Amino acid sequence: MKATLIIKNIESLYTCDKDFTVYKHAFIACHHDKIIDLGVHDYKKWIDSATRVLDACGETVIPAFIDCNFEGFSKVRLGDQLRENNSALYAMKTNGILTILSDKKRIQKKELTQDVFVRKQESKYPIIEREQDFHELKPQKFIVSCGFGKPNSYVYSFQHLSYILFNMYKVDLRTLLESMTSLPAKTFGLSDRGSLEKDKLADILILQVPTMEHYYQTLGRPLIHRMIKNGIPFYPNWIVC
């Protein structure tokens, strides 16, 4: 078995595994929708003539984001709900949120570039949607959500809230990154995603920054260079693997 996709020369690879392993100058290899290898050793054994290779020199690689509390539009006609919800989900996808959980069954869908699942349980951790939520609770562990669909809330990205939590409230990097990747995956039974490990889904973001500290210290500039869902790069353009 050879890799269908390899990302090489990664400046910082945040796996979000149980030990929060971070590799420098690393690679990640995927076979179709699954990760088959990653680390700092030689990746050439995984390459054949059909392998697509992406160069992430100077860039950061992390698991794709997960939002566990999408409510969507409810106080409009059904046809308008479907249209507006699809538009909102697309906007969230462009900001790296490739898995979404909702308690609204009508929103459920699974497609090549984004999964929307029905949330079947409540979170044992606080869900932080606004600065005020964190200010009031000051939790040690939490899950971040855009809170889309709440009254007067049309937020499509984690970037603004994560900037505030990292820079104003001094939330440590591991807690913050896990709150939008591995912790929601673990909490809601999404055992196939949320971290970059062997046999996990290849849902991956490549960011135009050398470290996640740079990402959380930046606001107002798009930083996602590439997005990969189920091992297929689809943003900024499709690459067949």
PLM-predicted stretches and their roles:
Residues 14, 198-241:
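C-terminal cap of metal-dependent C-N hydrolases
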